[in-house]
Amino acid sequence: MNTSNVGWIGMGRMGAPMAERLVKAGINLRIWNRTRSKAEPLEKIGASIVESPADLSGVDVLATMVSTGSDVEAIYFGENGVLSGSGVPKIFVDFSSIGVGQSANIRARLAELDADLVCAPVSGNGKCVKAGKLSAVASGPKKAFDQVEDIISTIAGRGVSYVGEGELARFCKIAHNVMLGAVTQNLAEITVLAQKAGVPRRAFLDFMNNSVMGSIFTRYKTNAFVNLDWTTTFTPTLLRKDLDLGLAAGRELEVPMPVTAATREALQAHFGAASLKDDPEGYLQGDFAALLETVALAAGEKLESENVPYPTGLE
């Protein structure tokens, strides 16, 4: 695949550092973002900004990293979308987390235009991208995947797992984010439990991180839990969307998911607790790790920052 003719759409918390890795790897990237100012830093290091998605219709590979399936559909098929231009990219690579049915519909519409879709959702956040510790899971036509594997691997420093045809990668990412929600909720619960028993959060989480239950994720989130730092990596709203996708998949495939259902209800309580804040909407734009505050509220436990920096493992 000609890596000198690649387009990229989406410059959010994930999209910008992902696209940056491609530019720094020497790929001649043409980019578009709804808010142009978010794309301008990449222009300074060699990317080219276009005026609309339609201007990317002539690229060989079109990559997207956006929030929802509706965003993907609008970018591909909408007014001034990529396919409103004069050409059709050969391969579409979508890194977004969207529903299985919506992805299948997008794939079918692209197939009518002789274009392939490779789904490549990722695991990690913006700091993981920059540290080269992002991973990806991919599905779609094997021939198309082989042509864009180098592009995906450039972004996913920990590697990409090809799992088969169609929307299988979507199922994997939905399952991944279901686990993300359940682990975060449980970690918040046991952290509040330990604190209420008298254990400082840093001491408890340090023990957990060094135990067989520790992980890249628990270590990374420790600083947030210890110092009440809700700098956004992933919002509660997006997590709720993914839990809903997981429950929908469970119903479709007749898989009981009681832990996921309980996590979804616990997360909903966080939206209610947000109404107690001075700026509920702004609060919900913060990080999903703030679930810790909702658990503490329900337990009648007061949280204060311990003001003790903790290494994230991504330094």
What are these regions (language model features)?
Residues 29, 49, 117-118, 201, ...:
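Hydrophobic beta-strand scaffold residues
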Residues 75, 97-178:
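Rossmann-fold dinucleotide-binding core
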Residues 310-315:
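ATP-dependent carboxylate/acyl-activation modules
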